[in-house]
From Swiss-Prot:
GO biological process: chromosome segregation
Function, in words: An essential component of the chromosome segregation machinery. The ParABS system segregates newly replicated chromosomes during bacterial cell division. After DNA replication the ParB-parS partition complexes interact with ParA ATPase, promoting the movement of the origin region towards opposite cell poles. Segregation may be driven by rachet-like mechanism where ParB follows a retracting polar gradient of nucleoid-associated ParA.
UniProtKB keywords: ATP-binding, Chromosome partition, Cytoplasm, DNA-binding, Nucleotide-binding
Signal peptide: none
Name this polypeptide is given: Chromosome partitioning protein ParA
InterPro entries with a match to the protein in the record: AAA_dom, DNA_Partitioning_ATPase, P-loop_NTPase
Entry-linked Gene3D superfamilies: P-loop containing nucleotide triphosphate hydrolases (3.40.50.300)
Lineage: Bacteria, Pseudomonadati, Myxococcota, Myxococcia, Myxococcales
Gene ablation phenotype (knockout): Essential, it cannot be deleted.
Quaternary assembly: Monomeric ParA interacts with PadC; PadC recruits ParA to the bactofilin scaffold. Probably cycles between a monomer and dimer; ATP-binding promotes homodimers which bind DNA, ATP hydrolysis causes dimer and DNA dissociation.
């Protein structure tokens, strides 16, 4: 626990009390294997280690965000499915984690059926937004882990979010599907959520030995400019190991390169949120 305190101190706590309505950030990329869930877990853990009240909502039927934080299937008392389809208050679905300031709303494979079941629901694209509304003042950050698709579950996340963070692996097919995702974001802004913003693109799985990785970084930074986060997440063995132990990297190996990168991402994100920043109003 002492090492987490030191990690949190590295951020600097700044002014407390100004973030009365937390920001909702969804982590999305319809292409699988880009580090989406890894980013959701470890960004949430990094923010929590800085004593930011953080909620991680798992909208991926694979349920890896919950299991990656040590939530065992046998111990799950409620999932996001129940909030979306059964109108169960989301306050009843919160699960604690090893980090004091981090809670999670888990998912199970039952969520797969929600794509079909939501079709006939009233306000089907706004079910998550309405479920999260009572929690708006309880958290500094709500992180949503989206499924690797652009169906109704992802649309719910985009409609509920203030911004989208897109993980992008530093590999040959990195930009494949990115244009489709940005097009979907534009459509959501036109209809479901006019205030939705691009939080940024996070370059992941960077291998400094591979020329193609450097080329991807150059190409993405050249095209998206300031929309790309400064930090780059490297390929890291410890980062790939920690989910099997049910721990975020900050609890598994705080000295690893993977941990350093996600702590840096948390710092970079929090620098954008100053007391002068306009806060979202609760409708």
């Amino acid at each position: 626990m002492h090492c987490i305190t030191r990690g949190a101190l590295a951020y600097g706590r700044g002014e407390r009390g100004w973030a009365t309505v937390g920001r909702i950030i969804c982590i999305s990329n319809q292409k699988g294997g880009v580090g989406k869930t890894t980013t959701a877990i470890n960004l949430a853990a990094s923010l929590a280690s800085a004593e930011r009240r953080t909620l991680l909502v798992d909208m991926d039927p694979q349920g890896n965000a919950g299991s990656g934080l040590g939530i065992k299937q046998d111990n799950i008392t409620g999932t996001i499915y129940e909030a979306l389809l059964n109108d169960r208050p989301i306050q009843e679905l919160l699960h604690p984690t090893e980090l004091r300031y981090l809670q999670v709303v888990p998912a199970t494979p039952d969520l797969t059926g929600a794509e079909v079941e939501l079709v006939n629901q009233d306000n089907r694209e706004f079910r998550l937004r309405d479920a999260l509304r009572p929690l708006a003042a309880e958290y500094d950050y709500i992180i949503i882990d989206c499924p690797p698709s652009l169906g109704l579950l992802t649309l719910n996340a985009l409609a509920a979010a203030d911004s989208v963070l897109i993980p992008l692996q530093c590999e040959y097919y990195a930009l494949e599907g990115l244009s489709q995702l940005t097009h979907t974001i534009d459509l959501v802004k036109q209809g479901l959520n006019p205030d939705l913003k691009m939080e940024g693109i996070l370059l992941t799985m960077f291998d400094s030995r591979a020329n193609i990785a450097h080329q991807v970084v150059e190409e993405v930074r050249g095209y998206f400019k300031k929309q790309v986060f400064e930090v780059i997440v490297p390929r890291n063995v410890r980062l790939s190991e920690c989910p099997s132990f049910g721990k975020p990297i900050i609890l598994y190996d705080i000295k690893s390169k993977g941990c350093e990168s996600y702590l840096a991402l948390g710092r970079e994100l929090m620098k954008r949120d100053t007391p002068k920043s306009p806060r979202r109003r609760v409708a």
